[in-house]
Amino acid sequence: MARGGFPGGMGNMNNLMKQAQMLQKQMQSMQEEIEASEFEGSAGGGAVVAKVNGKKELIALNIKPEVVDPDDVEMLEDLVFSAVKQALEKASEETSEKMGKLTGGMGMPGLF
């Protein structure tokens, strides 16, 4: 064993550091790509459509006039809630899938 307790000496440590830096750059690039993406969710057969970006921010909400009923506000609230929730779930799934491929299932919980 080489000095410092690292098998193979400092060469292996340098390689590990380079790999970690490369992975960090790839993850940052992937995160930027995801943040620029848009995800759509809909409810009521497309009567309500919500769009979020990869930062999970609501960027658009479209409501068809025929679903606006002043006597049934609760239905409209449910449709909006469902559409936004679906869009957010798509954003989360895409983020997890892409980052999972990049990290190779290294088990890095809480990153994304």
UniProtKB/Swiss-Prot annotation:
Region entry Disordered, spans: 91-112
Protein's UniProt keywords contain Cytoplasm: yes
Record keywords, A-Z: Cytoplasm, DNA-binding
GO MF: DNA binding
InterPro entries, per database record: YbaB-like_sf, YbaB/EbfC
Chain intervals with Gly residues compositional bias: 102-112
GO cellular component: bacterial nucleoid; cytosol
Main location: cytoplasm
Compositional bias annotation for Basic and acidic residues: 91-100
Pfam family, one: YbaB_DNA_bd
Domain of life: Bacteria
Location(s) in or outside the cell: Cytoplasm, Nucleoid
Quaternary structure and interacting proteins, as annotated: Homodimer.
Family: Belongs to the YbaB/EbfC family.
Stated role: Binds to DNA and alters its conformation. May be involved in regulation of gene expression, nucleoid organization and DNA protection.
Name of the molecule in the record: Nucleoid-associated protein CPE0046
Organism listed in the record: Clostridium perfringens (strain 13 / Type A)
Highest classification ranks of the organism: Bacteria, Bacillati, Bacillota, Clostridia, Eubacteriales
